[in-house]
Amino acid sequence: MIFLKRIIQQQESELMNTYNNVNVEKLANIYFEGKVISRTITFSDKTIKTLGVMLPGEYEFKTNSKELMEIISGELSVQLEDETNWNNIKEGMSFNVSKDSSFKVKVLKTTNYSCSYLD
């Protein structure tokens, strides 16, 4: 029984790393001279996400909508607008960004991320 439970948990975990029935834009979003690259995906319910990679460095982003940034792999520090503290974010962690704001990141290790647009 325990073995079967482990298999089910592994399958659930693998499913969470895959998106099905989506449209992917062929043209990549390229920022900071190619050090941050993402692709936009649209789900059947019109939900939009970007999947991307950030190379080590420091970057500042502006937002038009509320965002959920999920770190798939890698490590970075984030400073949200109007905050003085930097927060360390690693694989499996996430953070929220307010609409019409900005945030800074210091990417410590090459980072794969998923950004969900929540508006």
Residue ranges of predicted features:
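Conserved short histidine dyad/triad with adjacent acidic residue
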Residues: F43-T63, N96
